[in-house]
Amino acid sequence: ARVSNGALPCGTVDMKAASCISFATGKDKKPSAACCSGLHPLAQTVKTVEDNKAICRCLKTAIKNFSRVQDRFLGQIPTPCKIKGRLPCFHKHRLRKAPLRCIGLETDGFESSPLGMC
């Protein structure tokens, strides 16, 4: 089993975000209530930069299984779901294309990458 090395195992992260796939692939016009209600508790677990990086790594790995997921849709999820700053990987990063080392390093409300790598 994949482990996030953060507050939650990747299986839990994946399960909470699974309802967002229809929107992330462009099938639905807006994130479903189930998508938003899954992401809210996930966002609340983010307390540190490490928590954010771990969750974003899980999400990045999981979306590789869905070829139609588009970054432009992922980036739109926080607004209709009213998630502010706690899942920055949706706000700032292109999950499909960002190297894993960059996920979660430069984020809203968290410290920037100490090495300026991303």
Swiss-Prot record:
Entry keywords, A to Z: Lipid-binding, Signal, Transport
Gene Ontology BP terms: lipid transport
The record ties this protein, via InterPro entries, to: Bifun_inhib/LTP/seed_sf, Bifunc_inhib/LTP/seed_store, Plant_nsLTP
The residue ranges crossing the membrane are: none
User: Can you name one GO molecular function term for this protein?
Assistant: lipid binding
CDD domains annotated for this entry? nsLTP1
Give the signal peptide as a residue range, or say none if absent. Answer: 1-7
Q: Which Pfam families match?
A: Tryp_alpha_amyl
As annotated in Swiss-Prot or TrEMBL, what is the tissue specificity of this protein?
Answer: Highly expressed in haustorially induced seedlings and absent in germinated seedlings.
Q: What does this protein do?
A: Plant non-specific lipid-transfer proteins transfer phospholipids as well as galactolipids across membranes. May play a role in wax or cutin deposition in the cell walls of expanding epidermal cells and certain secretory tissues.
Report the family membership.
Belongs to the plant LTP family.
User: What is the name of this protein?
Assistant: Non-specific lipid-transfer protein
